[in-house]
Design a protein with these regions (language model features):
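Short glycine-/polar-rich loops that comprise or flank the Walker A/P-loop
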Residues: 1, 66, 95-99, 164-168
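Conserved helicase motor "Helicase C" RecA-like lobe of SF1/SF2 P-loop NTPases
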Residues: 75-119, 154-158
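Conserved RecA-like ASCE P-loop NTPase motor core of nucleic-acid helicases/translocases
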Residues: 65-75
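Conserved motor-coupling elements within RecA-like helicase/translocase cores
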Residues: 97, 103-149
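Secondary-structure transition/capping motifs at alpha-helix termini
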Residues: 58-61, 88-97, 145-146, 163
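A short beta-strand element within the Helicase C-terminal
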Residues: 149-153, 157-168
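Interdomain helical connector at the RecA1-RecA2 junction of SF1/SF2 helicase-like NTPases
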Residues: 1-66, 83, 87
Length: 168
């Protein structure tokens, strides 16, 4: 029989698991699971694909090709992941006319408990090192130029940001 487990094995496994069963706070567990899902590479790469393709198809041609978009993320770690996935996707697709900048405060560091973070652990991410094309310019001015079409933000520029080219 395929995929067969006898009662004796099931009983032993159940006994081992029951002895290690610990109660957790349901709210904390939900927060952790949601954080894991939001930061997972596959989830972010799929969202980035939709964002870029939507921008390319529906937004990019507005305002005589000058249209801009802003993507608001729920955390600084998420903003870093979106920027990395965004850059990877546009490179893979050969899209040279779509570039993103990322805006967040301070430094972002990943740890071993973050999903798919092994390649990111030990690195410090800042606006400066994630936006090499700023070339000393202030972010608002750089975003107004032709160098950037999409701004990925976390806890920044969400209110009071006046960019007339912002269409999406």
């Amino acid at each position: 029989l395929k995929n067969y487990t006898n009662y004796k094995v099931v009983y032993k496994l159940t006994q081992k698991l029951a002895s290690k069963d610990h109660e957790v706070d349901a709210k904390k567990a939900k927060v952790k699971v949601n954080q894991w899902v939001r930061l997972h590479d596959h989830n972010i790469s799929q969202k980035v694909k939709v964002i870029i393709e939507h921008f390319k198809k529906n937004v990019m041609g507005l305002l005589g090709g000058q249209a801009k978009a802003m993507v608001v993320t729920s955390s600084r770690k998420e903003a870093v992941r979106y920027k990395l996935a965004f850059d990877k996707y546009v490179t893979e697709q050969g899209y040279q006319s779509i570039q993103a900048m990322v805006a967040f405060s301070g430094e972002v560091e990943f740890n071993d408990s973050d999903p798919n973070s092994s390649a990111l652990v030990g690195q410090k991410f800042t606006e400066h090192n994630m936006n090499p094309n700023l070339k000393g310019r202030e972010m608002r001015k750089a975003f107004d130029s032709d160098d950037y079409q999409v701004m990925l933000v976390a806890n920044k520029f969400q209110t009071g940001f006046d960019q007339p080219k912002l269409c999406a």
